[in-house]
Amino acid sequence: MNRLIIFVWAIAFSFAVNAQTKQFTDSIVVGDIAPEVISKDTLGVEYKLSDYRGHWVLLDFWASWCGDCRREIPTVKAIAKEYPELVIYGYSLDRTAEAWRNALRKYSLSWVNVSDVKGWSHSAPPFGIRWIPTTFLIDPSGVVRAVALNETDLKTQVDSILKNK
């Protein structure tokens, strides 16, 4: 009986560890060309991800209602400060413009931030996003160099890649 209990706990633990370490995306892998993202900022200005070819880009999918996203903001701000040449391209998966605008103001997000205010329906699917925040580091050629970064490894991964570019 004790062996059965230990076996069941071991299986449950392995599923929990796998769920924690599993990537937050099922479509994009390192080496892929990043899919196009086109959306507008709060003033209605359209931004295309491809407009930033020639630059390193940190593409961050987030939402105002997401606690993990809010906890990630100081890390993204620190990266933006340390790497001023890095383009931060935020894509909000909010469903209301008011919530999105309020979050931009509240957290003083000064980088490019766009949304279609349709939640997960439009821009998230090409990236296979299943959880937010999910962040991608894209090189100047548009190639994904890091996938599904999250708060715990975001700074380390960005440092590792950009300091060795």
Residue ranges of model-derived segments:
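Structural microenvironment flanking redox-active thiols in thiol-disulfide oxidoreductases
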Residues: 71-107, 119-125
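Short loop/turn microsegments at loop-to-beta-strand junctions
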Residues: 34-35, 57, 132-133
